[in-house]
């Protein structure tokens, strides 16, 4: 059993931004955005029969350790193991129902977006081609093919794969499905907030991982609509803080995408999502690799929940920045659980070694 506070590491990366304590303005006073709370509500009505209404569970022991009340939304329990089911479901459903439906869909992804698109394409009877980087682990390729998609390996990065996916889409009369910078994707991801705040209306603070920003943008739209004083914090890693730089108008620092939280290591944030987050998010908090590793370990040991690095980033931020949240009712989205088993084993073993719970003995015995 972990002792109180033992998973808090280092000093704080930063304090809350200047807007964190300011009263939220009414959405009607802000410049128009490409997605609205009404869009999120309509998305929920459209997809709720085709996705999992995932549970939002209280974690009283962890909350007590941190001086707050804590709820965890288990998007790890979606059909494909992540929140990506939501946006993919809405986008593909609209494409399939359009007057001129495409011959199929194409996407570029090395992870959860690939599986979300593949799953819902098969459900809707659409052909799906997923372009993955050449370095994609075989386990991810196998899972995506197992959901009925054609996998094409092309490019050294997701950015290069995206170029090829768009070319394939044009050649085959397919629709290209962007992982986050699409109003329908944002609206679909935002349905997680409808469930979460309906299930636990006491929540007054949301902590949400941010890669391209689709999940955080969609959830912020609904949360601020329901309660303008609800705080919304995004979370990125210190190795890849692209969205934080974008919404602050700061130079984008050198990005490192080789991180345990690779699902949110996005170099190019969305235009649609950045505009929403710039207006609605209270701050974007940073976490480091040890924070993320420890969050994965604590969630597995104490909550019996397996989260991938990106999925655990929100909880990592709550532990690192607990002083910002003390006394509040905090909802954290565990946005994905698709972690490679070997990686999970490595992370758990490192945690046991760090906590002094594994010892190596070397015994020399005379023959």
Regions found by a protein language model. Give the residues of each.
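Residue-level detector of intrinsically disordered terminal segments
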Residues: 11-12, 32
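PLP-dependent amino-acid enzyme catalytic core
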Residues: 32-367
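Short linear motifs in low-complexity or flexible loops
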Residues: 3-4, 15
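Intrinsically disordered, low-complexity serine/threonine-rich segments
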Residues: 13-18, 47
């Amino acid at each position: 059993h972990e002792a109180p506070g033992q998973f808090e590491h280092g000093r704080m990366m930063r304090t809350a931004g200047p807007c964190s304590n300011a009263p939220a303005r009414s959405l009607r006073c802000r410049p128009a955005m490409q997605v609205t709370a009404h869009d999120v509500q309509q998305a929920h009505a459209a997809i709720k029969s085709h996705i999992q209404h995932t549970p939002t569970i209280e974690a009283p022991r962890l909350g007590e350790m941190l001086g707050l009340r804590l709820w965890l939304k288990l998007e790890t329990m979606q059909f494909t193991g992540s929140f990506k089911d939501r946006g993919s479901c809405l986008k593909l459903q609209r494409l399939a129902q359009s007057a001129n439906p495409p011959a199929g869909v194409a996407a570029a992804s090395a992870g959860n977006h690939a599986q979300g698109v593949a799953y819902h394409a098969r459900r809707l009877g659409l052909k799906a081609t997923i372009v993955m980087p050449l370095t994609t682990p075989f386990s991810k390729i196998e899972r995506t093919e197992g959901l009925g998609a054609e996998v094409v390996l092309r490019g050294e990065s997701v950015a290069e794969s995206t170029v090829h996916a768009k070319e394939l889409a044009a050649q085959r009369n397919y629709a290209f499905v962007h992982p986050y910078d699409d109003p329908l994707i944002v609206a679909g991801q935002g349905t997680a907030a409808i469930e979460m705040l309906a299930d636990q209306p006491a929540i007054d603070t949301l902590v949400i991982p941010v890669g391209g920003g689709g999940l955080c943008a969609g959830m912020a739209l609904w949360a601020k609509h329901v309660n303008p004083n609800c705080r919304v914090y995004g979370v990125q890693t210190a190795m890849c803080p692209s969205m934080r730089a974008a919404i602050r108008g700061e130079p984008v620092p050198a990005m490192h995408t080789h991180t345990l939280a690779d699902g949110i290591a996005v170099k190019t944030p969305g235009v649609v999502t950045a505009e929403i987050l710039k207006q609605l998010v209270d701050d974007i908090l940073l976490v480091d690799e040890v924070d993320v590793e420890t969050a994965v370990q604590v969630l597995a040991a104490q909550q019996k929940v397996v989260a991938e690095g990106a999925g655990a980033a929100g909880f990592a931020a709550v532990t690192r920045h607990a002083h910002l949240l003390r006394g509040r009712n905090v909802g954290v989205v565990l946005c994905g659980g698709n972690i490679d088993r070997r990686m999970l084993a490595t992370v758990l073993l490192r945690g046991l070694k760090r906590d002094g719970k594994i010892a190596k003995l070397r015994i020399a015995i005379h023959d």
